[in-house]
Structure formats: C-alpha cells, structure tokens
C-alpha cells in the first residue's frame, strides 16, 4: 500500500498550482461560526495557515491514506514573516467582531500539519501567535494540532506559560484505538502506546487533550466502521480526554481513498452510522460530564462527504441533529432520530448494513 500511496502523492503534488506573493501572505481560510465551548455554547474562530505542509505527507511513507491537505501547502520552506502575515490578516479581519460579540470564543489554529514542527511554524512565530491570543479575554479556549513526534516538554511549557489563562487543547489525530487499522489501513505512522505516552506528557504540563477519531477508514464496511468508532469513543471516554472530535471520512483529492472511491470500492459513511455511533457509545448523559464530543463533518450532505441519499431534506435534517447535539451536549438530541426520519433510504441502509 505504501508504494501506491507514494505514487498517488507524487502525482498529486505535481498538480499544486504556483502561488503568488499575495497567496503566501493570506491564510488558506478563516471563519467564525457557532461552536461548543467546555461549559457553554459559544463561537469558534478558525484560521488555517499555509505552511510547507505535513512532514509525514511529504516523506517516504507517502502520508495518510485519507488526507489530501498537503495540496493546500506551499511544499517549500516558508519564511516566518509570511506565516505571521497570514495570521495577522485573519486576526485583523475578525478581532473587532470577536471583541463585540456576546459569546465567548474558542480559537483553532490549523496548518494542515503540525503546529509544533519547526519546519512549518517555528518558535518565533508560535510566540507571536501566543502573544496576540493572550491579549483577548473573549478567547477562552485554544486548539492546535500536531503529530506526536513534535510534542516535547519545552514546547508545551512555553505554550502554557504564554496562554496560562486559557483552556488549551493539543489535538492529535489518533483516528482509531485499533493499531492494525491505524497502521495498515490509514498509514498513520502512530502506535497507541506512543499516543498514551504523549497523553501523559500533555497532562503533566496541565494542558488538555483533543482526539480526532475517523468514522469509516478505507477497507472497512459500514458495520465494521461503526464497531471501530464506538470502541474508540468508549476508550477515549475511559481515558478522560477533554474532547473527542469524530470526523467522518470526506473524500479528498489526491488520496488513496479518492482512488478507491473512483473505482467504486469505497463509499463515505452514512449519517445513520454517525448517529448509531453516538448512541451506542454515549449510553448516559453522565458520560459527557468530563469529555465533550463534537463532530463537524467536512463535505456533509455531498457525494464526497458523509451522506444518506440524494435527498437534501434527509441530509439537512441529519446535519441539524448532529449540530444540535454538539452545541448542547444533550444526549436526548440523538435519541430515536432514525424513527423520526421518513426516507426510503433507511431500508437501503439497513440492507447494506446487514449484508454488505
């Protein structure tokens, strides 16, 4: 599989367009929208920075089988002032709105790689970002993401020192608690024991842990995908991570999953499956007493993202259910949902779930 991943990645990198000076000074994207904070409804301010890209994706192993974010990267080393300008352009565009808003905020700084990889975002840039965030009281929570190999005590201590008045979460793409699936189907290059070691390191430095779980990795059918996701959610709740983010696969260009989908060997998960995962794993409201569970699926309702059928109403209803659950953290929002959906696709789903 690694050889196939390398070939797909190599061809995908050839399709990356040349970027202008303006492109390098502006982030890939940024936005504000409703989100769930630890103990309240609030809003998120998300900034996606353009860096040289994930080192794992650029390496000899070919990257993860489902991730195509490297296509948004610059590939070459990007000087610090470009990253600072990207952050500033997003920051300056939204900071007045944030300070005037009635809601509190969570800021998410993503770079489609690792925030603590110095080849993507160096210490000087990180300190610059911390300084800006620390000055805004409306921002109560901070999320950054990283592969485990770039997490160390020095980096975590510096972040804690600069942002000690905020709730900080380090997001890790564990994807599944099953080593076999993560290594052989996702090519993640991460063992569960390594994840546990980093969890201890993060907790030692009094920071929070956010775990990404993937719904329906390639080579799993719908039933197996549900079982894997439920088992992983339960394990993370037992581990008392601060946040679980469930990410149903969306088919990104230039990936092995995209290749399988085009060969009709893969279908994104059904919304019914996501609801089933949540109901099976969260058997009582008390389980959400410490861990919040969120899901904001990319491409939801499209053929490349999580969807039920081609009926817009059916998909929109399911998106609404998931969104209401995330914002309220009330398990009643996901109970008996399927019974309330009057759509012919339910029968097709159950037949496939049993026999395929």
Task: Describe every region a protein language model picked out.
Residues 1-18, 26, 251-356:
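Auxiliary Fe-S-binding modules of radical SAM enzymes
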Residues 94-102, 129-137, 157-167, 200-206, ...:
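Acidic (Asp/Glu)-rich catalytic clusters
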Residues 119-127, 152-162, 223:
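Distinct, well-ordered alpha-helical segments
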Residues 30, 36-85:
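Canonical Radical SAM [4Fe-4S] cluster-binding loop centered on the CxxxCxxC motif
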Residues 43-47, 105-109, 142-144, 168-172, ...:
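Hydrophobic faces of well-ordered beta-strands that scaffold small-molecule active sites
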Residues 193-255, 275-297:
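Conserved C-terminal portion of the radical SAM core fold
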Residues 70-90, 94, 98-123, 136-151, ...:
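Core AdoMet radical
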Residues 64, 135-138, 227-245, 314-341:
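Structural recognition of alpha->loop->beta junctions
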């Amino acid at each position: 599989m690694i050889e196939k991943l390398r070939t797909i990645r190599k061809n995908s990198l050839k399709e990356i367009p040349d970027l202008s000076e303006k492109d390098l000074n502006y982030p890939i994207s940024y936005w504000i929208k409703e989100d769930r904070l630890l103990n309240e409804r609030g809003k998120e301010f998300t900034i996606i920075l353009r860096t040289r890209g994930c080192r794992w994706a650029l390496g000899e192993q070919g990257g993860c089988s489902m991730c195509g974010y490297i296509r948004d990267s610059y590939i070459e080393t990007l000087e610090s002032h470009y990253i600072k300008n990207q952050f500033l352009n997003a920051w300056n565009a939204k900071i007045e709105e944030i300070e005037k808003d009635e809601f509190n905020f969570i800021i998410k700084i993503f770079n489609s790689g690792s925030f603590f990889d110095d080849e993507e975002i160096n210490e000087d840039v990180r300190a610059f970002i911390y300084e800006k965030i620390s000055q805004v009281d409306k921002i109560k929570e901070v999320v950054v993401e990283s592969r485990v190999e770039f997490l160390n005590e020095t980096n975590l201590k510096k972040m804690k020192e600069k942002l000690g008045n905020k709730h900080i979460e380090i997001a890790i793409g564990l994807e599944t608690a099953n080593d076999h699936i993560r290594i052989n189907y996702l090519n993640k290059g991460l063992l569960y024991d390594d994840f546990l070691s980093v969890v201890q390191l993060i907790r030692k430095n009094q920071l929070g842990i956010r775990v990404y779980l993937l719904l329906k990795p390639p080579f799993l059918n719908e039933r197996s995908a549900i079982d894997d996701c439920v088992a992983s959610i339960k394990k993370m709740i037992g581990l008392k991570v601060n946040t679980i983010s469930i990410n149903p696969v969306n088919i990104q260009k230039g990936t092995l999953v995209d290749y399988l989908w085009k060969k009709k060997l893969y279908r994104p998960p059904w919304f019914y499956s996501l609801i089933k995962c949540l109901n099976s794993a969260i058997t009582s409201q008390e389980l959400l007493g410490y861990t919040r569970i969120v899901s904001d699926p990319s491409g939801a309702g499209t053929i490349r993202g999580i969807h039920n059928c081609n009926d817009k109403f059916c998909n929109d209803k399911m998106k609404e259910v998931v969104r209401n659950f995330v914002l309220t953290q009330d398990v009643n929002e996901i109970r008996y949902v399927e019974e309330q959906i009057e759509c012919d696709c339910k029968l097709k789903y159950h037949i496939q779930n049993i026999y395929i």
